[in-house]
Amino acid sequence: MEKCDICHQKFSNKTNLNRHKVMHSGKKKFECQFCRRPFFRNDRMKEHMMTHIKKGNTFECPITACNSKFNSFTSLQFHVDSEHIIRGSSPAKCKSCIKWFNSSHRLLLHFHTAHLDHTKFFSFKPAPILPKSTTSILNPIKNPDDFDRIFDFFKTEIAPLFPLHSTVSQAPLPQCSRSVKSAKELSPTPSTEIETPEEEELDGPESWYCDYCKIRFDDKVMWYLHSGLHSDDIPFKCSLCGSLCDGKYDFAAHLVYANHNF
């Protein structure tokens, strides 16, 4: 284990430690090419760039030998997850370079931020972005079964992680323990030929992360459902009723205790 000599946080390897120590320097050297917002880390900057890119109107499947095209990123994402089985035992190769990926999320992120000519593929002008704003992965949730599922999940798993009137903890990120059937199989042992993900700083299998609530999900479906609760324009605006919340604690409490009738 590697340990930061400034804040004493521990990391599984030196690469993750060095990436972490950049934040202590105060220098944000990675800049979004759309809105010029600076970031400490390249992977966080790429995730942010996708909030602009998803507003486009032409999306091509990034997998070699597949020529499918879509008019929304959500449709492309559904296509990749349902038509192409991407995991450790069957990685996919980017059609524009020699890199292989064992995660559809990482492949889509790589393809759209590393290769595309955005002025050609996306006919829009990026609007000024609000602090910490992003575009939700999903459209607002409409299935009643999904509502019941996500609210039950918040009450039993998420609410205890956000006690009211508490201060921000310096402890490691909370890990959701909900055991639900995963959207796809994952392999804990990726091929050595596959690009090492920059965003991974925790040991264990691939997880899905909410950048606003600071929660990692072991299950992709629950991450999808959770992401859909954040509004497109303002992260802590409830997509179900439009209520504005004051940060992640207020947002979690609102989802658990507010009366959402549909």
UniProtKB/Swiss-Prot annotation:
Composition bias type Low complexity, residue spans: 185-194
InterPro entries in UniProt: Znf_C2H2_sf (IPR036236), Znf_C2H2_type (IPR013087)
Subcellular location: Nucleus
GO CC annotations, alphabetized: nucleus
Signal peptide positions (record): none
Domain of life where this protein originates: Eukaryota
Major location category of this protein: nucleus
Comp. bias intervals (Acidic residues): 195-204
GO molecular function, one term: zinc ion binding
Effects seen without this gene: RNAi-mediated knockdown results in abnormal gonadal development in 10% of animals whereby gonads fail to divide or grow in size. This abnormality is enhanced in a tra-1 (e1099) mutant background and is accompanied by masculinization of gonadal tissues.
UniProt region (Disordered), positions on chain: 179-204
Example GO biological process: regulation of transcription by RNA polymerase II
Family: Belongs to the krueppel C2H2-type zinc-finger protein family.
Role description: Together with the zinc finger protein ztf-16, plays a role in gonadogenesis, specifically in somatic gonad precursor cell development. This is possibly by regulating tra-1 gene expression.
Entry protein name: Zinc finger protein ehn-3
